[in-house]
């Protein structure tokens, strides 16, 4: 089963890469020229002082390479595949026996369509991937008390790293704890 999932995600990544490279190659060049990444200490420090500044730096760092052939499609396909893998981990944690592969791909498709907009920034996908990865890790914690404490710590950390996506993370944590009927789940509110 593990090899089946790896093969599935490799096929998804390859299909995304091929689609993006053949149909939207010049889109990535345009996106790169509309953003600027300065590799100076002052610029990085000023960005890191802002909530969500870390994700902004990561996104701008990745976008600067979109000028190179194939890199824009490669980075975008990798980010979207990462979102799909995290979604699969979350769905398997909630409903372990479901084999709904299409459910894993739906958030990827929504983000893919948003990437077609010239005004959409890669930072949104980076933030969403960070939130999904933390949520997937959060759901793997077995001890109820440790999980609730981790949730209370992760929300402000995620807000500092990725910005307002932390509100979605907090809502998903409350929903997860409420549906699991964790004793004193309301503490997560």
Language-model features and meaning:
Residues 77-94, 133-137:
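Transmembrane-helix motifs of polytopic, lipid-linked glycan transferases
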Residues 55, 59-69, 92-95, 114-121:
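Helix-loop junctions on the outward
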Residues 140-156, 185-187:
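Short hydrophobic alpha-helices at membrane interfaces in multi-pass membrane enzymes
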Residues 30-33, 48-52, 72, 76, ...:
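Membrane-interface micro-motifs in multi-pass membrane enzymes
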Residues 17-79:
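Membrane-interface coil-to-helix junctions
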Residues 169-188:
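Perimembrane helix-loop-helix junctions
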Residues 14, 67-68, 80-84, 89, ...:
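Eukaryotic intrinsically disordered, low-complexity segments enriched for acidic and Ser/Thr/Pro residues
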Residues 1-16:
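Start-transfer (signal-anchor) and selected internal transmembrane alpha helices
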């Amino acid at each position: 089963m593990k090899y089946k999932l790896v093969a599935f995600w490799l096929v998804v990544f390859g299909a995304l890469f091929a689609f993006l490279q053949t149909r939207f190659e010049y889109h990535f060049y345009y996106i790169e020229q509309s953003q600027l990444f300065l590799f100076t200490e002052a610029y990085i420090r000023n960005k890191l002082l802002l909530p969500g500044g870390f994700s902004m730096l990561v996104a701008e760092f990745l976008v600067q390479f979109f000028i190179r052939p194939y890199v824009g499609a490669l980075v975008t396909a990798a980010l979207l595949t990462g979102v799909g893998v995290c979604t699969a981990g979350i769905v398997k944690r909630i409903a372990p026996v479901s084999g709904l592969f299409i459910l894993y791909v739906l958030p990827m498709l929504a983000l893919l369509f948003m990437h077609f907009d010239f005004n959409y920034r890669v930072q949104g996908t980076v933030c969403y991937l960070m939130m999904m990865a933390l949520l997937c890790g959060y759901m793997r914690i077995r001890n109820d008390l440790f999980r609730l404490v981790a949730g209370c710590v992760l929300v402000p950390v995620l807000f500092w790293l990725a910005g307002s996506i932390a509100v979605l993370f907090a809502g998903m944590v409350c929903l997860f704890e409420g549906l699991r009927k964790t004793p004193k789940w309301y503490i997560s509110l």
